[in-house]
A protein has these predicted regions:
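Helix-to-beta-strand junctions that scaffold the AdoMet/dcAdoMet cofactor pocket
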Residues: 120, 216-217
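Mobile active-site "lid"/loop adjacent to the S-adenosyl-L-methionine
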Residues: 133, 170-211, 227-235, 253
Length: 273
């Protein structure tokens, strides 16, 4: 894989000696993982090792033709990167009773279907997607998952913040980003990457959080995530949320064998089934 020169320079400065591991992993085969729908009670594809931080997550020995699998279309499972399933640990750590939860940037539905399975009974999940065409895909996946008490909406974060002040106990914001975490899965994405786009995405992420902040209850939980590695979109935006919006960073418990440390950076690694 031909990585952008600026990406190599910036990421090598960030990771130091670990950059070689990242570079090798980006050229390795992409592990395939799925999350089982606990409500369906139907068999899923033959799974391999479990995803350590997700009770319903499993790696597959090989990628299947999911579009030809009726169980996939019936919502018996969802194909999702294992790193995205770490949302489960944040919810388990801090959500103990029924809540009103907003998944702000929800399409295509991976985190929303996971939230639907995780939230305590009696919770309300609102799944939002600002791009109308993507909201149709989101609605389809939510319907296939089949969980009640879930609403799909198509609104701008600013409108939600103004119309629904202090309504949500939990807001999940998997904000649009420069997609550095997509390089291994979509090699064409390397050609779309640039430092200018990183800066644009970082600014957009701050705006999204600023616009939605008013919808979060005082003392509520905001979960911020991206699928990228740079500090502008990650640590610097977290710093903005803390310093400018008055948030408090909360720890998420992890197990030593997960090899997740510090700022919870998920970097692609080679995986052997």
């Amino acid at each position: 894989m031909a990585l952008p020169i600026d990406f190599i320079t910036r990421t090598r400065a960030l990771l130091g000696e670990e950059f070689e591991r990242l570079e090798a992993a980006l050229s390795a085969d992409v592990p395939v993982s799925i999350r089982i729908n606990p409500m369906k009670g139907t068999p899923a594809p033959k799974a391999g090792a479990p995803v350590a931080w997700c009770e319903s997550g499993f790696y597959l020995p090989e990628r299947l033709s999911f579009t030809f699998d009726p169980l996939f279309h019936a919502g018996a499972y969802y194909v999702q990167e294992a790193s995205s399933m770490f949302l489960e640990q944040a919810i388990k750590a801090y959500v103990k009773e029924p809540v009103r939860c907003l998944d702000l940037c929800a399409a295509p539905g991976g985190k929303s279907t996971h939230l639907a399975s995780l939230l305590p009974d009696g919770s309300l999940l609102v799944s939002n997607e600002v791009i109308r065409s993507r909201s149709y895909v989101l609605a389809e996946n939510i319907a296939k998952w089949g969980h009640p008490d879930t609403i799909v909406i198509n609104n701008d974060p600013e409108d939600i913040g103004e119309a629904l002040p202090h309504l949500f106990d939990v807001i999940v914001t998997d904000v649009p980003c420069s997609g550095e975490g997509m390089f291994r899965k979509d090699t064409d994405s390397t050609g779309e990457w640039s430092v200018d786009n990183v800066r644009l995405c970082a600014s957009r992420g701050r705006r999204i959080i600023h616009d939605i902040w008013n919808a979060l209850k005082p003392g509520g939980i905001l979960i911020y995530s991206t699928c990228t590695y740079n500090t502008e979109e990650d640590e610097e935006n977290i710093h903005y949320i803390i310093e400018e919006l008055g948030a408090e960073a909360l720890p998420i418990p992890t197990q030593e064998e997960w090899q997740i440390t510090g700022a919870l950076r998920f970097e692609p690694v080679s995986y052997t089934h």
